[in-house]
């Protein structure tokens, strides 16, 4: 019975719980606090604190009721809490659960449930603060691409909604300060998945990309890539926070594993940028490191390669114990009507996977129908999950019945009465039907007007009574044509003005017109009282005057003025006696005659001008005896013919004799016009001609004709420049030379033909850098030697390296014929061996041999068991013999290559390699010797990821060697001994490292071992630089992490090596000498951050002089001196540093040479 009662209460509580809205009613503030070290306050950079106002009224809200705040474009809540309480005065009235949208939804929600503390008598209100971060994109998912357009830099309006209640606030978002043209990266923590979404956008290429490779991978093994959640695309643009706003497919190849994701792409069009994003799981999502591949070729540009490494740090969004679990997000379709996010039950002691379910409703299709009825009905055609359900909505509509009636209003009104219980509604239409109206207007004593309507029953007459105050009166007196006086009153409408018009008979009028000085006319009426006489005064401006002069028959002059009425024009008529007349006749260019009278002013003389067309003219030219010419015109009357008589003096005469084709002589006179020259032409038969051609010194040709008198012989003289000459040399079979000149006609080219006996020929074959062969013949002048040069591509070379029993190395090149393969045979002496003993944690001893390349040193590593108290041991020295040669001249080239590698906060390594090539010039007859010496400087940083040094300690081995190579002719064997020893130990007292010591000796055929100190000087010194190799090997640090101070250990070794070669030189000259100094140093630094830095560098300088004098007798002695000052560093296990002088180690080394 109790169980049934409990179930009943549960059912009742569920049945009565409802969804309410409008609880959140104000957006009070939205402020930003920097949750990390962000450089700008963008919408996606935590934390934005939203303060919202809320109100719960117990009369409308009940315990168990729910309400939801929908927050568009909110990505997550930046808190480890899962809920927040709405409290007032310490009392909780509702609990709200955080549901972050993250990568699943474009919005976040706050789902709240009313608590039992809310009763009908309580109305609670207050504020709540929500820490959150907005979503403005960050991946290529559909959710992020949609939210990438939520905001822009500057002022934005953020709007949340609680049901139909919207609350808003304006906020200013700052633009990203990262240059969008470079590569772009972003990482964002997804708290519900305990994962990070990581984005990488390629650098901008304005014209598109030809090809490229991009991606990222874990650096220290603390990151795993989720290959099932990857987006790859190209975006048309970026928003103000450098996130893609679109994603389009393109051609690429993807390689993904748990260690990294990489894509290789080609042909990205202009305006697009490729990007890739993925989910990653990190040991600590708030601190991890990624290495990025960044290679690309812009269209029309060069290949770019710029890899980089980034260490990401952040803040924790969840409790400390929540890290390390696997969280899976799944989507499930349910029969609910809204989308929700829920977390399935999870027991960390039993379950291994926490599941977040995204519950989505079954999609529906709505069909709307209608019918005649009262209620709306809904019917659902269900469908299984995975299909689409159908909702049929049947909406009712009513029919109507219209009732029309009349009323006394002035408009037609329509009223619809909806029947709530039936499908027939009533429409009442009222049509106006007014009574006739009678309006009566009357005046009364009040100063205001009133209107009173007396309404009669329908069908009768209504009365409108208007009472008006009396009108104002204006009296006007005017004249009219009658002879008596009348008075008329015009009553205006009420509120207007009445008029009283008095009409009087007109007064008699007297008009006076006068002229005045103004240019206009005025009329002034002087009105007399009624019955008197009015006066009209007209004032006129003076009239215009037109003066006309005319002739009359009298011999005297008269003037008459005709006055016009005012405003007209007065006329002045002047009559003059006629003027005397003069007639002039002239010719003009027209073909007709005209007569024109030019009237002069009265009293002068008029002119009659007759224009005649010109007469025809006849010109006659005749010669006379005078030496000048004259022209005389005899003018005829108009219409006849004029005569022009020209008299010319006689013309000059020019006589010309010319030849023609006839065999007889003629004379012709050509008369020129007067003043010209008459010509007398004598034509003679042609003379016979003789032509002569000769050469002269000028560069052009001329032709001169020497004409003889008629009947004789003419001469034509042609002068030609000398011809050009072409000399051709050819070989023939005779043993002697000949020269023949072939002369061409003038203006052409003479030929000089030289015949030479054939030259001797020398053929030379040489190699060049091209891949094909050519043959070139260099022809020498006659009598010389022709050269045939055959250029062959270099032969392929096969190098074979083998060991032999000698202590020196040789290189022999066997040159094959062109087109075949040369063989380089390198014979190397066996490598020297260095034995190193190390201690390890195993209970047995083993040995490993590390074989170096020829010329290097093989290493035998003996791994021995470790005991708590172990005596330091020294490895027996190993001797390496080197045979060296001394050359006359050294040419030295140096090349340095530096490579830097950085890995986040774990430090950087720099490796610098310098290579020197020593060669002998080709112009001396000594064998070519090439010696390469490398200098390597390595700086490294070691770090313990856990922050605790290992107890096994650190072993630092420093090896420093100095080599001097020389060549002598004839060769004298020289031995260079290299001694390497290593000291090992545990964390107790004792040395941990020692330098290598080089002892050099000079041996001739009769000596065994000689060590001495000597110095030699030379006058001609050429300073060169030779580098000496050095190496540093370091294992784990041994300093305890409890030390707060930094410990610095410095090891310095200085050595001076003097190599002197003396020559017993009877012919004189300087003996070659060499001086070498070496200064290696090692610095070790340890600090409380568990970082040890070791740096080894070695510099050596060498000076050398050479003799050019031929050596006839040689006796050689090699001396070496080594001075070593070295401080050994010992860690005693407690963090103290003990330094020991290394003279004892050096002594042990020397003693070991004789063991």
UniProtKB/Swiss-Prot annotation:
<feature type="disulfide bond">
    <location>
        <begin position="205"/>
        <end position="298"/>
    </location>
</feature>
<feature type="glycosylation site" description="N-linked (GlcNAc...) asparagine">
    <location>
        <position position="651"/>
    </location>
</feature>
<dbReference type="GO" id="GO:0009986">
    <property type="term" value="C:cell surface"/>
</dbReference>
<keyword id="KW-0336">GPI-anchor</keyword>
<keyword id="KW-0677">Repeat</keyword>
<comment type="similarity">
    <text>Belongs to the ALS family.</text>
</comment>
<feature type="glycosylation site" description="N-linked (GlcNAc...) asparagine">
    <location>
        <position position="795"/>
    </location>
</feature>
<dbReference type="GO" id="GO:0044406">
    <property type="term" value="P:adhesion of symbiont to host"/>
</dbReference>
<keyword id="KW-1003">Cell membrane</keyword>
<feature type="compositionally biased region" description="Low complexity">
    <location>
        <begin position="1071"/>
        <end position="1115"/>
    </location>
</feature>
<dbReference type="Pfam" id="PF05792">
    <property type="entry name" value="Candida_ALS"/>
</dbReference>
<dbReference type="InterPro" id="IPR024672">
    <property type="entry name" value="Agglutinin-like_N"/>
</dbReference>
<dbReference type="GO" id="GO:0009277">
    <property type="term" value="C:fungal-type cell wall"/>
</dbReference>
<feature type="compositionally biased region" description="Low complexity">
    <location>
        <begin position="1010"/>
        <end position="1019"/>
    </location>
</feature>
<dbReference type="GO" id="GO:0044003">
    <property type="term" value="P:symbiont-mediated perturbation of host process"/>
</dbReference>
<keyword id="KW-1015">Disulfide bond</keyword>
<feature type="compositionally biased region" description="Low complexity">
    <location>
        <begin position="949"/>
        <end position="965"/>
    </location>
</feature>
<feature type="glycosylation site" description="N-linked (GlcNAc...) asparagine">
    <location>
        <position position="615"/>
    </location>
</feature>
<dbReference type="InterPro" id="IPR043063">
    <property type="entry name" value="Agglutinin-like_N_N2"/>
</dbReference>
<protein>
    <recommendedName>
        <fullName>Agglutinin-like protein 3</fullName>
    </recommendedName>
</protein>
<feature type="glycosylation site" description="N-linked (GlcNAc...) asparagine">
    <location>
        <position position="759"/>
    </location>
</feature>
<feature type="repeat" description="ALS 5">
    <location>
        <begin position="510"/>
        <end position="541"/>
    </location>
</feature>
<dbReference type="GO" id="GO:0009603">
    <property type="term" value="P:detection of symbiotic fungus"/>
</dbReference>
<dbReference type="InterPro" id="IPR011252">
    <property type="entry name" value="Fibrogen-bd_dom1"/>
</dbReference>
<feature type="repeat" description="ALS 7">
    <location>
        <begin position="582"/>
        <end position="613"/>
    </location>
</feature>
<feature type="disulfide bond">
    <location>
        <begin position="73"/>
        <end position="150"/>
    </location>
</feature>
<dbReference type="GO" id="GO:0030448">
    <property type="term" value="P:hyphal growth"/>
</dbReference>
<dbReference type="GO" id="GO:0044011">
    <property type="term" value="P:single-species biofilm formation on inanimate substrate"/>
</dbReference>
<dbReference type="GO" id="GO:0030445">
    <property type="term" value="C:yeast-form cell wall"/>
</dbReference>
<feature type="repeat" description="ALS 6">
    <location>
        <begin position="546"/>
        <end position="577"/>
    </location>
</feature>
<dbReference type="InterPro" id="IPR008966">
    <property type="entry name" value="Adhesion_dom_sf"/>
</dbReference>
<feature type="repeat" description="ALS 14">
    <location>
        <begin position="834"/>
        <end position="863"/>
    </location>
</feature>
<keyword id="KW-0843">Virulence</keyword>
<dbReference type="GO" id="GO:0030446">
    <property type="term" value="C:hyphal cell wall"/>
</dbReference>
<feature type="glycosylation site" description="N-linked (GlcNAc...) asparagine">
    <location>
        <position position="1099"/>
    </location>
</feature>
<feature type="disulfide bond">
    <location>
        <begin position="96"/>
        <end position="112"/>
    </location>
</feature>
<keyword id="KW-0134">Cell wall</keyword>
<keyword id="KW-0130">Cell adhesion</keyword>
<keyword id="KW-0325">Glycoprotein</keyword>
<feature type="repeat" description="ALS 3">
    <location>
        <begin position="438"/>
        <end position="469"/>
    </location>
</feature>
<feature type="glycosylation site" description="N-linked (GlcNAc...) asparagine">
    <location>
        <position position="471"/>
    </location>
</feature>
<dbReference type="InterPro" id="IPR008440">
    <property type="entry name" value="Agglutinin-like_ALS_rpt"/>
</dbReference>
